[in-house]
């Protein structure tokens, strides 16, 4: 946010196996839902509890994106996924809940019924299904993932940074305003 030379960011995992597998949910469940982990006030990866980011963020999802990892991806503005990406909020399978924004963001992005279908079952969703559901913007082969994310970033960089920031701000601030006139 503070770097004036940076207009857009890309968040990705190391390697091709996982974007982020999230917390060790079985260990956390065995600990009664409590773990001695230090999560910044800005949330997982410094993103899930930040609601006023002015610069666009692109999640380049390579492989597994589960639990907190999926919540990180959902906190980004765009998701580009490799064909081997898998998404889920599996917390209910071990007696936990996705408390880093996943339960709030997913229904807003794909609708309540589709989101509940994922959240109440903890089922895994492929990149293709994620695109069909509406939370993935593009699906590419794993070796093309970073280049595809950079392509989205280049398209954003071709626009005015002030216009991009204003567009993002207005879109997020008015997302839940049902009255069109009030949202204007």
Predicted feature descriptions by range:
Residues 11, 24, 73, 106, ...:
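Terminal peptide-recognition signature
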Residues 1-7:
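A short, well-ordered alpha-helical element
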Residues 5, 13-53, 93-96, 175-178:
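Glycine- (often His-adjacent) and acidic-residue-rich active-site loop
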Residues 44-54, 60, 66-120, 133, ...:
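CoA-thioester-processing core
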Residues 16-20, 66, 88, 171:
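Short, active-site-adjacent cap segments at secondary-structure transitions
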Residues 80-85, 136-184:
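C-terminal long alpha-helix characteristic of the crotonase
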Residues 112-116, 125-132, 160-165:
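Short, structured loop/turn "capping" segments at alpha-beta junctions
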Residues 22, 44, 67, 100, ...:
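Glycine-rich phosphate-binding loop at the start of an alpha helix
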